[in-house]
Amino acid sequence: MKPLLVLLLLLLLDLAQAQGALHRVPLRRHQSLRKKLRAQGQLSEFWRSHNLDMTRLSESCNVYSSVNEPLINYLDMEYFGTISIGTPPQNFTVIFDTGSSNLWVPSVYCTSPACKAHPVFHPSQSDTYTEVGNHFSIQYGTGSLTGIIGADQVSVEGLTVDGQQFGESVKEPGQTFVNAEFDGILGLGYPSLAAGGVTPVFDNMMAQNLVALPMFSVYLSSDPQGGSGSELTFGGYDPSHFSGSLNWIPVTKQAYWQIALDGIQVGDTVMFCSEGCQAIVDTGTSLITGPPDKIKQLQEAIGATPIDGEYAVDCATLDTMPNVTFLINEVSYTLNPTDYILPDLVEGMQFCGSGFQGLDIPPPAGPLWILGDVFIRQFYSVFDRGNNQVGLAPAVP
């Protein structure tokens, strides 16, 4: 027993040391752009202006032929954090996005309406800035975000990455970024996703020995007023944010944080992926998305119907709606209706939108299901680059 006790004490000491080395980035929760537009009665016009029918969506996304991000992924984003670039620091609000790998912020040279509505980066005001000069382009829906690549210090809650290459956008498409609560995006995906061959921020954190462990983790609070307690943690994970033990799931392709699904169950019936399919765990997507034909069946199964271009349910039926369970690595991850239905107040009336959305991701990248914030709110998520695996456990409210 004595050697076992010593081993246990050593493990506890290692855990305590790892806890002390955690770098926590607070995430603030804001009203999503979709809710803003819905409250202003402008959501239908937004669909029309972007040529989108959200009830029959098949927006193509193929990251292997070009760097392409579905624009609608950011329509429902609610969790944001702060970073700084340069010396002295210039602050920006960003989405920490595991579904992409580039860092970009608006440039002072940008003339798009979105840049006029957000802070912009001034390279001439940073003593540590280096011009790289390469061009980059990321496709968002039907428009491109384009710019040049520079290098500078990037700081995230006490972690300072030297010589980080990042995108300075000079053109941003559409109205989505105009009204967005965020200024830019910090990608946490694998290097193979990065436009312009840029080394992602977290890879540089590891290379510069800034993190104790080669992993980061995400906790998204369900608190609708500000998301109190939500955080991104670099260098490890915090056991106080989840119950039980982590289930470790191998990454099947090192681009997105892609894992295998064993099945998707609605109520007591496995409706999808009965022979297995692929999914990504993505902090840069608010909803849960899947192939449009499968999502249409899922909407019907939960009783959701099209209303003003999106799916919603009668708020009075939540008690009778089915659970939706994702079977992953022989473990069940169950969402009850209050988890996957998104309440809103529109002109004094309760609105209950569906947390599921159709999104066509064709081969070779797809088809894919995306487990976005609707899923991550319920399951604490650890992204382990050292072992190329994702850890999931029930989140503690």
UniProtKB/Swiss-Prot annotation:
PROSITE patterns documented for this protein: ASP_PROTEASE, PEPTIDASE_A1
GO cellular component annotations of the record: endosome
Signal sequence, start to end: 1-20
Biological role: May have a role in immune function. Probably involved in the processing of antigenic peptides during MHC class II-mediated antigen presentation. May play a role in activation-induced lymphocyte depletion in the thymus, and in neuronal degeneration and glial cell activation in the brain.
Pfam families: A1_Propeptide, Asp
Catalytic activity, as annotated: Similar to cathepsin D, but slightly broader specificity
Tissue: Expressed abundantly in the stomach, club cells and alveolar macrophages of the lung, brain microglia, spleen and activated B-lymphocytes. Not expressed in resting B-lymphocytes.
Protein name: Cathepsin E
Known partners and oligomeric status: Homodimer; disulfide-linked.
Disulfide bonds: C110-C115, C273-C277
SUPFAM superfamilies: Acid proteases
Any single GO BP term: proteolysis
Subcellular location: Endosome
Broad EC category: hydrolase
Entry-listed glycosylation sites: N91, N323
Keywords of the record: Aspartyl protease, Autocatalytic cleavage, Disulfide bond, Endosome, Glycoprotein, Hydrolase, Protease, Signal, Zymogen
Gene3D superfamilies the UniProt entry points to: 6.10.140.60, Acid Proteases
